[in-house]
Regions:
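Bacterial extracytoplasmic/cell-wall-associated proteins, especially those involved in peptidoglycan
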Residues: 1-111
Length: 111
């Protein structure tokens, strides 16, 4: 339930966006050894609300975690809005490997 709620909080309602967020969380668990969703939220600095969950987030979590699928065939670790990225020159995200933009969110891997 917490996983579905943070996916909703980090992206909103879009199914594709929810899949990208879910994959980012899964990559943190697989590659960084986080042992819980709460640890990922704290360790990766997620700030999205955890008050609610959308059906798209529920479906995305099932697709990425339960069915072991990917949103894209590349690791995803970090994300930020394009507005944040553009308004904060030299931010952490600008030092990472840009992978894709979906709607107003940029997704990154490490170098």
């Amino acid at each position: 339930d917490m996983l579905e709620r943070i996916v909703t909080g980090e992206f909103g309602g879009s199914y594709v966006g929810s899949c990208l967020i879910a994959q980012s969380i899964k990559c943190a668990i697989v590659y960084d050894g986080y042992t819980s969703v709460s640890a990922v939220i704290k360790g990766m600095g997620y700030v999205g609300s955890t008050a609610n969950r959308s059906q798209n987030a529920v479906n995305a979590v099932k697709y990425i975690f339960d069915d072991n699928n990917l949103a894209v065939r590349h690791r995803l670790f970090y994300m930020c809005t394009k507005d944040y990225y553009d308004s904060t020159p030299g931010n952490f995200h600008s030092t990472q490997n840009f992978i894709l933009q979906y709607e107003n969110v940029l997704f990154f891997d490490r170098w």
